[in-house]
């Protein structure tokens, strides 16, 4: 039997140009399984070593390149390797872990096309080239927020590395099969590419389309996050389908923190593999059954209606011009998914009692527009039906009105009280979640994971 070797895709370029972005996007579009290996793992010393006073990371002699070649060769030939990981958060090396080869090995770093031995191991060579102004902006953003550097340290590192970049990194460009360039444009950061062979065009076209789709996705997430009446804290989730695959926000993440590679997951249609961290939203199953684009929110004014005994009657009245379904309260996650799967496919709006709103459409822009319209109608209804003004000290809710107030009570107590106040002032009857409902929520593994992620996000917010 012929020995089938794995593909190695080498991605090279200066520091902070988007090599990791390209690597992670490739894992999403390649049909066969792919893993990313970071060239930074080859650094000889930890961050605090005095050796870095004499060398830069761009100097080949400061990296274990011969060991890199041996490990790449093993992965190419289906041999497991043990590899330590350079942790940029700590500046130290994490303990070595075993890595099993897959069909596509994406090797990204500073020296991946440095010499003939690397280039001979490589099946596709990619060089990432970025406008200097953009490169500095990206490097500042990454190193300040993720790697713990000061602004002064970042600029000093850029200055110190200039000569080594010209000597060791830039010459690799001429050996690449593909050159990808990021640059500023009127519509934001654009990605362009040049290739020596037409055989890569299909892959590059998918890569470019996914990058543009992710930019739109991030933009919508950030815009929704600014609508405080639609989502609060880590509530709500958004998704869009790309070539049948699902791009969805992560569990416990704040929409304002979603990025091209952060707080979102890519779920492959072929094998269900999930690319990205943290795990996808627990409502992923519902998103899969809905149309191309989905926005799930917890609009406060709408919740004041949905958390009342009169919810169904009012929803039928004020949203009679919409194609919608009303679902009585069911546990988030799998139970909601089962109901969504059975819905009337003509319905593009789902009202979930004591929970929130799903809007699905052909585009995220359309979803957002409909979501705003629905929230506006709820706001108008409450305004027109206000019966009394409650004393500020007397509107503490007598129970939990929606799931997030149960799972994350500390950060949602004020919202729960505000919803209760609006219900009473509108002459409606509050519908609290039962103790049984609350116990089920607190025992869901998906909710436990979300609590963990929310706690982690809170810690990060405090540090910054």
List PLM regions with ranges.
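NTP-dependent small-molecule kinase module
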Residues: 1-3, 100, 163-208
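The conserved Walker
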Residues: 15
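Conserved lysine of the Walker
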Residues: 19
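Hydrophobic positions on the alpha1 helix immediately C-terminal to the Walker A/P-loop
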Residues: 22, 26
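Conserved nucleotide-sensing/catalytic segment adjacent to the nucleotide-binding pocket
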Residues: 35, 44-90, 104
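ATP-dependent NMP and nucleoside kinases share a basic, alpha-helical "lid"
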Residues: 94-145
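Glycine-rich flexible loops
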Residues: 204-464
